[in-house]
């Protein structure tokens, strides 16, 4: 039987309010709290909460044989705490099953890793501290923003205490190699690399509801046959 690694990524930014020229020097609060509340609450009830309930149900129905992982940004955690705390209660239940791993990522879902290693480390530590405080878990795997990875980053990830990293299974990098294997980082062999299967992931993320797609509708049986 093949092992399937499910990773679900959650991020919600703080949205900026309309800021006019005449507000400069007078109004120093830049965020649209009403819009943040509306979007985060709506998305949580339409997507995040039903998905988390489904994951919890699958874990319970399969006696822990079903496993998954979740990467959630610090910004998202802040907003859920403020607007939809019941979703965090669900994530806490998932954490307690021992079948859902929490993966670290930059607190602000930023691009700090590209040019500011100290800021990147600070944000990652902030996320890890928040996950430890809220769910009692310590991440050992990291998913950088948009799955960004480069060899110079690997030693820093090891220094931060990570054993593995998720990254993109980019065709132009892999060439003939498959994304369905665990690789070692060339610059830090202790770091394991898990690659996203672009096709199988995008079949769910983007093509699932596309009625113009040649494989629509995507059924469970069809998807399982592709995995095999």
Language model features with spans:
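Catalytic alpha-helical scaffold of carbohydrate-active enzymes acting on polysaccharides/glycoconjugates
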Residues: 1-141, 147-202, 207-209, 213, ...
